[in-house]
């Protein structure tokens, strides 16, 4: 039986996760030119400045009408059996603090993603086919629209999945249901904590044994 994480454990998980994300970061706020993969999804007006806390939730449930980007039609729809394999990329600084397609605010440090057609917000399992790492991510934005990529993930997700440096990875994406409008991410955090690769990483954190 799976035992729910207590609030203190959730807080500790957040600290450990922050430490892991911080490891390997450059000293500059932005990555070196050319290092950050770009999405052709249009960016909205920035409403949260760099360094300021990004509120969770605040958006609405949205499926949307068919739309066209660069001559290609996309048809949003409920798709409970969605299970696709393809190339993932990530987006970060250029979109951080801006509104997503359903009215939330993109946080590059959150476990989130953008998808061309799945309902917003929804949950998906994303597995890196090269290293086997899997995350549960909140889909709250539209995109990507580059080279038939199947999903754009946040910078944090790309780092956890192990492809931040390279920029893209072959992944499997599976629909996991609707996400709460409140932005509650405890389900994603619990799934992360349950992964063996993540627990190994925690065991190597500088203060893991304290």
Name what the model sees in each region.
Residues 1-13:
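Bacterial N-terminal signal peptides that target proteins for export
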């Amino acid at each position: 039986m799976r035992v729910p994480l207590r609030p203190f454990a959730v807080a500790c998980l957040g600290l450990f996760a922050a430490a892991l994300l911080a490891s390997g970061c450059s000293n500059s706020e932005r990555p070196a030119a050319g290092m950050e993969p770009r999405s052709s999804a249009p960016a909205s007006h920035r409403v949260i400045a760099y360094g300021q806390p990004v509120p969770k939730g605040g958006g609405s449930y949205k499926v949307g009408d068919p739309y066209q980007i660069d001559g290609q039609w996309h048809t949003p729809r409920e798709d409970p059996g969605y299970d696709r394999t393809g190339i993932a990329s990530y987006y970060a600084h250029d979109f951080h603090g801006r509104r997503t397609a359903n009215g939330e605010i993109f946080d590059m440090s959150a476990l989130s993603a953008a998808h061309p057609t799945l309902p917003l917000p929804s949950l998906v399992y994303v597995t890196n086919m090269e290293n086997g790492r899997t995350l549960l991510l909140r889909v709250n934005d539209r995109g990507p629209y580059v080279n038939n990529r199947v999903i754009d993930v946040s910078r944090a997700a790309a780092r956890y999945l192990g492809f931040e440096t390279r920029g893209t990875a072959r992944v499997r994406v599976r629909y996991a249901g609707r996400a709460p409008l409140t932005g509650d991410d405890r389900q994603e955090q619990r799934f992360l904590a349950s992964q063996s690769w993540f627990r190994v990483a925690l065991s190597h954190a500088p203060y893991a044994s304290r």
